[in-house]
Amino acid sequence: VNPEAAALFIRDYGDVLDFVIGSIHNMEKDLDVYYYDFEKIDVSKMYDHYVDWLLKLSEMGDFDVMGHLTYPLRYMFERNHLRLELRPYEEKFRQLFKNLTEKGRGIELNVSGYYKAMQDAMPPMSILKLYRECGGEIITIGSDAHKAEYIGFYQKEAHEMLETAGFRYLTVFEHRKPEFIKL
């Protein structure tokens, strides 16, 4: 989390941005979660700490949508086939979603887990439904496409997930203003 650097960037370039995603990749010591050795740590404790960082970001960052809320889960599964039960974090997610909705922000449904080992979206259906239950309406779809061939992947599945979770609209942004498109 580097809100100061992000704020400077947005101040200097905000007039040309349509959309700003806030996300957490790194926590302490600037080590991306990607590099964690999940066999040597208490993953429940680490994920609890990760959600605390998401809460901090929700309170102080200048962004439109929070990206891939369950980022560590992708690598827990990819490397160690670990699946973490998210129910213990439900109250923190409720607070996170309250923070986001009160500030007119949303979340991203990231489908990159489908074309990686995890075979699930980030966040999974249980968290999508919780976000909707908490009043969340602003939602985007991202594919985390680090390669051109992944742009637009799994859009049909993403739309179906959103409809199943109770969403009626997908959100796009222009000049950082949300626009709602019927699913």
What kind of feature is each model-predicted range?
Residues V1-E102:
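Extended substrate/RNA-proximal surfaces in nucleic-acid metabolism proteins
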Residues E28, R79-L183:
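Charged catalytic cores and adjacent phosphate/nucleic-acid-binding surfaces used
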